[in-house]
From Swiss-Prot:
The lineage of its organism: Bacteria, Bacillati, Bacillota, Bacilli, Lactobacillales. Pathway: Carbohydrate degradation; glycolysis; pyruvate from D-glyceraldehyde 3-phosphate: step 4/5. This is Enolase 1. CDD domains: enolase (cd03313). Its main location: cytoplasm. Catalyzes the reversible conversion of 2-phosphoglycerate (2-PG) into phosphoenolpyruvate (PEP). It is essential for the degradation of carbohydrates via glycolysis. The active site is at 204 (proton donor), 337 (proton acceptor). GO terms for biological process: glycolytic process. GO terms for molecular function: magnesium ion binding; phosphopyruvate hydratase activity. (2R)-2-phosphoglycerate binds at residues 162, 337, 366-367, 388. Disulfide bonds: none annotated. It comes from Lactococcus lactis subsp. cremoris (strain SK11). It catalyses: (2R)-2-phosphoglycerate = phosphoenolpyruvate + H2O.
Amino acid sequence: MTVTIENIHAREIFDSRGNPTVEVDVRLTDGTLGRAAVPSGASTGDREAVELRDGGARLQGKDVSKAVANVNGEIYEALKGQSPFNQAKLDHLMIELDGTKNKSRLGANAILGVSMAIARAAANSEKIPLYRYLGGVDLELPQPFFNVINGGVHADSGIDVQEFLITPVKRASFRDGLEKIANIYHTLKKILADKGLETAVGDEGGFAPKLGSTENAIATLYQAIERAGYVPGEEIAIAIDPASSEFYDDKEKVYHFEGQKLTSAELLTYYEGLVEKYPALISIEDGFSEHDWAGFAAQTKVQGQKIQLVGDDIFVTNPEIFKEGIQKGVANAILIKLNQIGTVTEAIEAISLARKAGYKTMISHRSGETVDSFIADFAVAMHAGQIKTGSMARSERVEKYNQFLRIEEELLGLEVTK
């Protein structure tokens, strides 16, 4: 029996920030169901695919009833009766149906929900895990980066840098690495509490204390790592995401950072000093604005052989924009966010480009998440090498890490059989 798409149904659900988002069910003729929920970002690149929201009085203008209607109407009509096993064909059908460069007519949130749900339905129909359906048999778990201190637009902490992350560079297994991070997370919480600082968490599950500066935050991470019994730089490394587009003045061409106005050259000097002072700092994401390609390229020339420099807002997971970045020598790694581009196929294309150009890849969640663990399977399938999906708090973050534990068991043949 030939299996085809029988029904596609979208609904409005809520994400981890209390905002509406799109969830899609794809039902196949063999009775198989694939379900996917779409995340949403707070710090977004200007050239991201368009998240369609209604903009009216309902739900602060953020409702997604138009995107839902587009799935249940046009997209369903275009895809019904199609085989679910040709992901690229179906994704390109939706891209053509939308007819815009940035998916603004149907909405990237509508298209991505269907794209992800189709992949999951196809995997379920084949009775294999999603990571194996997307990636075949040659698979590996990524190195996880945990956002344990939140700043920027993700928290009201007074720190300009948006994310301070830790990663287990020395680990026997994914579980071993996760346990190390859990130990540091709880140690960090105690250190903050002992200092009388806030231990409430931000959007991504990290703490949001008013530490005053980037250096204070990094020094506090060093303290937590050491007090938990690990060696900074040797066992546990640090990464930051300044999300510098958020504090860049495009008119003055300066960065409003920690009470100062810094030129691109001055900000680069600051980053150089930071890496020299804190050698456990191995990765900087979006150190320069998406509108400051020259600044980003200069950083890559100076620091690109020493540390990882990740492009997020500057590339927005868009293969065409990324090609330009490769040609101009911008960054040495790319962040992959499915909802920045709007289809599984285009995200895979960006990863393929990175591999050919010698760039590293890091899969990422968004600040507005759901309990959908699609990106965990996707990271394993794509040999992404790295992932960041929040801290060790908030179920929508931890669910991705728990999915890696399940996948690790399966890959090691440790799962319970009945």
